[in-house]
Amino acid sequence: MDTRSGSQCSVTPEAILNNEKLVLPPRISRVNGWSLPLHYFQVVTWAVFVGLSSATFGIFIPFLPHAWKYIAYVVTGGIFSFHLVVHLIASCIDPADSNVRLMKNYSQPMPLFDRSKHAHVIQNQFCHLCKVTVNKKTKHCISCNKCVSGFDHHCKWINNCVGSRNYWFFFSTVASATAGMLCLIAILLYVLVQYLVNPGVLRTDPRYEDVKNMNTWLLFLPLFPVQVQTLIVVIIGMLVLLLDFLGLVHLGQLLIFHIYLKAKKMTTFEYLINNRKEESSKHQAVRKDPYVQMDKGVLQQGAGALGSSAQGVKAKSSLLIHKHLCHFCTSVNQDGDSTAREGDEDPCPSALGAKARNSRLICRRLCQFSTRVHPDGGSMAQEADDAPSISTLGLQQETTEPMKTDSAESED
């Protein structure tokens, strides 16, 4: 069932993807749960019902003492019979809208929905496929390809849509199945405990007088007695108990869920739509959250700062060497100039003047070399000073984290 949000449309009978397979709606609208094709969930349901009924009334209830045996037949038989009736009614009822049932010919094929002509299947309470006016809570089911009044959901276990016409029969089916599972578990546990404590209590039927072996048991009493060994009874009991427990868990959850829906005055369809809207709003809120964007910006800034910090360290080192060289050369030049002036007064000026000129020449070449190695040392050093350090990034992140926590608490 393809559900779509909207006030007038729930399901569009178009080709949809289900488990990566293209699923087309049936061309002929389905009348009820017995319309072909039958769903394999429906077949499994009836097979389990027949199997559990046979095991309950044919194997385990005959093990009970006479006083408990007749009570179990009445109580368990009443629950199973009630379940059978409501299950059949829920499957046989046509849950379609009243106008659909009056005006629709189920033998005629349904047209395919053309979205280029209409945005939704149902618009202004008119179905463009069924060609009838429907109620406000009517939805068009893709599995049945018809409008269902008071649409709740399409149940694969009864192979029919659940709407306002058959909802309470469906609810009674789930409730009676849960009650029957509980009765069967109680009977199985009693038989198991008595077999471990006092097996003779389970052999009260008069036909056991002819059975001498204590490991031989009679099944399907009193109509068709069949002698089997203890191992066979234990295997059947464990399988039935496991199947009963799994069914009870599934049916119990389903029953509690529908009790919750009735308390909230909602349908299954409305519950699913509301959940989808809440999830969509949460995703949009996360995308628009400024604190999430701030955290991403801080991380990006931190990654850039690490690179710029490394460049800044190199720039500062080269600039420091450049400054020391120039300072050294300046001091040497000054010493050289003074030495040269003293050399003019010295009786041997030629030797001292030559040394001064050589010193100045060496210093000039060193300064030129350092300038070529790092011509933009000043600008890179300034960039390194302006780049945020690791401690600064940590302070920014610690500052933003409490703000994000407060925002999350306010949203909750």
From Swiss-Prot:
One of its GO terms (molecular function) is protein-cysteine S-palmitoyltransferase activity. The active site is at 155 (s-palmitoyl cysteine intermediate). Residues 401-412 have a biased composition (Basic and acidic residues). It catalyses: L-cysteinyl-[protein] + hexadecanoyl-CoA = S-hexadecanoyl-L-cysteinyl-[protein] + CoA. Residues 198-412 are annotated as: Mediates interaction with IRF3 and STING1. Residues 1-42, 91-176, 252-412 are cytoplasmic. Its EC number is 2.3.1.225. Its main location: endoplasmic reticulum. It is a multi-pass membrane protein. Keywords: Acyltransferase, Endoplasmic reticulum, Lipoprotein, Membrane, Palmitate, Transferase, Transmembrane, Transmembrane helix. GO terms for cellular component: endoplasmic reticulum; endoplasmic reticulum membrane; endosome membrane; Golgi apparatus; Golgi membrane. It is an enzyme of class 2 (transferase). Residues 389-400 have a biased composition (Polar residues). The keyword Ribosomal protein does not apply. GO terms for biological process: antiviral innate immune response; peptidyl-L-cysteine S-palmitoylation; positive regulation of defense response to virus by host; protein targeting to membrane. It is found in: Endoplasmic reticulum membrane. The chain crosses the membrane at residues 43-63, 70-90, 177-197, 231-251. InterPro entries: Palmitoyltrfase_DHHC, PFA4/ZDH16/20/ERF2-like. Expressed in testis. It holds the Pfam family DHHC. Interacts with IRF3 and STING1; in presence of DNA viruses recruits IRF3 to STING1 promoting IRF3 phosphorylation and activation. Belongs to the DHHC palmitoyltransferase family. Endoplasmic reticulum-localized palmitoyltransferase that could catalyze the addition of palmitate onto various protein substrates and be involved in a variety of cellular processes. Has a palmitoyltransferase activity toward NCDN and regulates NCDN association with endosome membranes through this palmitoylation. May play a role in cell proliferation. The DHHC domain is required for palmitoyltransferase activity. This is Palmitoyltransferase ZDHHC11.
